[in-house]
Amino acid sequence: MKAVAFPAKIANLSFPSNCCSLFFRSPATFLSPALPCRKLTKGIRGLEGLMSQCLSSSSQSLSFSSNSFSSQPESELLQALPSSKPKSPPLQLPWLIVGLGNPGKKYQGTRHNVGFEMVDALADAEGISMNTVNFKALFGKGVIGNIPIMLAKPQTFMNLSGESVGQIVSFYKIPLKQVLVVYDDLDLPFGKLRLLPKGGHGGHNGMRSIIDRLKGSRDFPRLRIGIGRPPGKMDTANFVLRQFNRQEQEELDHTFQTGLEAIRILLLEGFNKSATFVNTRKSMEQLS
């Protein structure tokens, strides 16, 4: 039997693999070697009728076939796809808060160790354990608000504080603008606080060591705690190793509470607000 060409409307149809597989060798040509082809000898009408029956019985498979007909427009199919996951927030780098002092019971409660005491007060207030020794420091991690923080008290003795601070900054890749160093200052009146964005060491050996270990950079904030000047002709080295009397300790506790609030403002609201809170506090109290 001769091959018969299909009309264009039939030739352009696409069929699933399970429909009329015996009748077709190509989309546009009808061949008749198989027995079922005898049913189509009555002409194109018979062929169209059989095709209509085939399409009707296969409508369910056609509607779900990804390679043939689709009952949904492309826009609806795209909307049905699962939405992409929301982007994760950028990684929040921690703040490092370092208190300077000397290790050991011999130096507890001395003027040179007020940096240690400030960090201890912060750890107690925020429930942060400082029992781990790491990076040559008593070390702890916690959170204030949604800001991760690290607390450190170098155990290298004051003059080598930079060994510890340098290791922590390098290991965690902490930006220097997020390294706050708390230490004693002879040039400030007792109990007064001063928050600065950067500066030199001012003759403080602990700060000198830190600046050296940070490759000479001075661009990190510091919270200075005033311990006053030595009375009379007392040697400065002896003065900074003296312990506080009871009245001084009570005043210092009040200073620490102010320092805690200043650190919270620094982390949550920024340096400028914290500096305004700290550096204008004394004058505001005097006016009230």
From Swiss-Prot:
The record marks D184 as: Stabilizes the basic form of H active site to accept a proton. Its main location: plastid. GO terms for cellular component: chloroplast; chloroplast stroma. Its EC number is 3.1.1.29. This is Peptidyl-tRNA hydrolase, chloroplastic. It comes from the Eukaryota. Monomer. It catalyses: an N-acyl-L-alpha-aminoacyl-tRNA + H2O = an N-acyl-L-amino acid + a tRNA + H(+). It comes from Arabidopsis thaliana. It is found in: Plastid, Chloroplast stroma. InterPro entries: CRS2-like, Pept_tRNA_hydro, Pept_tRNA_hydro_CS, Pept_tRNA_hydro_sf.
